[in-house]
UniProtKB/Swiss-Prot annotation:
It comes from the Bacteria. This is Large ribosomal subunit protein uL1. The keyword Nucleotide-binding does not apply. CDD domains: Ribosomal_L1. SUPFAM superfamilies: Ribosomal protein L1. Belongs to the universal ribosomal protein uL1 family. Pfam families: Ribosomal_L1 (PF00687). It comes from Aeromonas hydrophila subsp. hydrophila (strain ATCC 7966 / DSM 30187 / BCRC 13018 / CCUG 14551 / JCM 1027 / KCTC 2358 / NCIMB 9240 / NCTC 8049).
Amino acid sequence: MAKLSKRMRVIREKVDGTKEYSINEAIALLKELATAKFVESVDVAVNLGIDARKSDQNVRGATVLPHGTGREVRVAVFTQGANAEAAKAAGAELVGMDDLADLVKKGEMNFDVVIASPDAMRVVGQLGQILGPRGLMPNPKVGTVTPNVAEAVKNAKAGQVRYRNDKNGIIHTTLGKVSFNEVQLKENLEALLVALKKAKPSSAKGVFIKKVSISTTMGAGVAVDQASLEAQA
């Protein structure tokens, strides 16, 4: 059996894997154990009471976290005319149509989010094999195909997170940075849970939000007692 690193031994000693911690305890524990030489992200895993094999029970969407994610987000927008000017004014780094598609085809993708107006999908549709595997393909379900591209750019810049359950019915996304204070991380988590509950499929029965765990980039998951959150399931 491989020897545990000193860091993992400390985590094992500090984190009780059988316990659910209050949100404030959980955040304090993450901060105590975040000893990496960079500012770690705080991520969340939410186990949903869905059957991910059924397409009508899959959960997908986006929400703006009240305190953002702590990341600088670069946005590319496929649009034209007045929408192009509006996208630039809203802060988009790259705006275009065929010229932007040519950059993507060359592999020049210096952006984190892609937004498109409906009239641009004829161009974007040709890029599915490039953008799709990278999770960058615009989709109306998460607000990245929209006639109001300026608002979508502002949301992306403000700290919008997109979420989609995996094959096990678990949502993975980010809540911010370990440098955020407890209130910021707690309110970001509560905002995400509110959005998830609004996205609950009508065919999903029983408890919808079954388990919530938070972790840092290099740390172990810490289960959160939902009773300590204002947005209880």
